[in-house]
């Protein structure tokens, strides 16, 4: 797992006003999300979420998650973002995407999908967290 944080002195009050939905279960090609049901890939954010359709922004495993993929997460006031790389960690997160989030003082976690789920669910209890989750390779 990799994590990039908010610079010292730039912390914000992150008590959740609206909770991010918990991930109930995850396995290869299948996720179950509280209040959203079952799907393959999800965008989750404070107050809700939806299926993550890679074709909307032209996402592919390489070059990976782009700033356009995370814009919606920030629109929902996320101060922490969890990016899953898939079960086999084939989904890349280029430096430009991390930089895009860091410039906006967003804490970023990048991890394999099952680990990303644990990080996200823990954070959902205490902060305005969002995430992109890919449940296959």
What are the roles of these predicted feature ranges?
Residues 107-117:
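A short glycine-rich beta-strand->turn/loop micro-motif centered on a GG-aromatic cluster
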Residues 118-124:
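Glycine-rich, charge-decorated loop segments at or immediately adjacent to ligand/cofactor-binding or catalytic sites
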Residues 73-109:
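Mid-chain, well-packed structural core segment of small domains
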Residues 125-137:
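A polyampholytic, Gly/Pro-enriched intrinsically disordered region
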Residues 2-57:
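N-terminal, charge-rich interaction modules
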Residues 52-53, 89-93, 119:
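Short active-site-adjacent helix-start/loop capping segments
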Residues 38, 73-77, 124-125:
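Flexible, charged surface loops at secondary-structure boundaries
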Residues 51-74:
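Compact, glycine-rich, soluble single-domain proteins
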């Amino acid at each position: 797992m990799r994590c990039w944080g908010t610079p010292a002195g730039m912390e914000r009050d992150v008590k959740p006003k609206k909770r991010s939905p918990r991930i109930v279960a995850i396995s290869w090609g299948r996720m179950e999300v509280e209040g959203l049901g079952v799907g393959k890939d999800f965008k989750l954010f404070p107050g809700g979420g939806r299926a993550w359709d890679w074709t909307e922004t032209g996402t592919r495993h390489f070059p990976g998650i782009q700033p356009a993929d995370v814009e919606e997460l920030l629109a929902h006031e996320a101060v922490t973002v969890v990016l899953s790389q898939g079960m086999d960690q084939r989904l890349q997160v280029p430096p430009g995407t991390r930089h895009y989030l860091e410039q906006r003082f967003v804490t970023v976690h990048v991890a394999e999908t099952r680990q990303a789920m644990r990080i996200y669910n823990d954070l959902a209890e205490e902060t305005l967290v969002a995430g992109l989750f890919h449940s296959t390779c």
